[in-house]
């Protein structure tokens, strides 16, 4: 409950203070569990993107299961926000061989799961194409702070100062080359 109850209000206030709008990729189950938070995100002008239902990695699902997860998450997000999500970020940032086609068929405007560039680019989606807004593991907090003994992930959490230095250097490098962060 720390994330939705303590961290998110702080993050939202910080974004408001600087006039920044952000994209939040939310699993359907989390949206159902924290409806007021999702409504607050939308009322502040932030984008809500699709992030699975129970954070299922698409590569572990067959095509029908993956389609059902996409449809279920989309229905939940539409019910809460009033809008069909435009963007998708895969749980675990891994896609199946069917993912891009399924996203294209459902009208998603973009995916944000791949790392083929450091600016948006077009990817083949079977019978069409979709915009890819790339991500990078270095810019995610998970590798630095994840601690989950149940999953065998017992790394010592990184120093926030060290992570800030990494992210700052990444920002400066991408900024200098006029790339996306």
Task: Go through the PLM ranges and name each one.
Residues 1-87, 92-140, 161-181:
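Catalytic alpha-helical scaffold of carbohydrate-active enzymes acting on polysaccharides/glycoconjugates
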Residues 134-156:
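Glycine-rich, positively charged active-site loop/lid region within alpha/beta enzyme cores that binds
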């Amino acid at each position: 409950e720390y994330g939705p109850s303590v961290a998110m209000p702080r993050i939202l206030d910080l974004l408001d203070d600087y006039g920044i709008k952000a994209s939040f990729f939310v699993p359907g189950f989390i949206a159902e569990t924290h409806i007021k938070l999702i409504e607050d995100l939308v009322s502040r002008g932030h984008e809500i993107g699709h992030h699975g239902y129970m954070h299922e990695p698409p590569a572990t699902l067959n095509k029908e299961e993956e389609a059902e997860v996409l449809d279920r998450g989309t229905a939940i997000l539409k019910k809460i926000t009033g809008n069909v999500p435009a963007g998708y970020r895969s749980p675990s940032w891994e896609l199946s061989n069917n993912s891009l086609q399924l996203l294209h068929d459902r009208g998603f405007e973009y995916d944000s799961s791949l790392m083929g560039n450091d600016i948006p680019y077009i990817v083949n989606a079977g019978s069409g194409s979709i915009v890819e807004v790339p991500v990078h593991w270095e810019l995610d907090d998970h590798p630095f702070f994840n601690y989950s003994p149940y999953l065998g992930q017992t790394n010592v959490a990184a120093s926030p100062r060290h992570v800030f230095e990494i992210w700052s250097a990444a920002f400066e490098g991408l900024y200098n080359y006029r790339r996306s962060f």
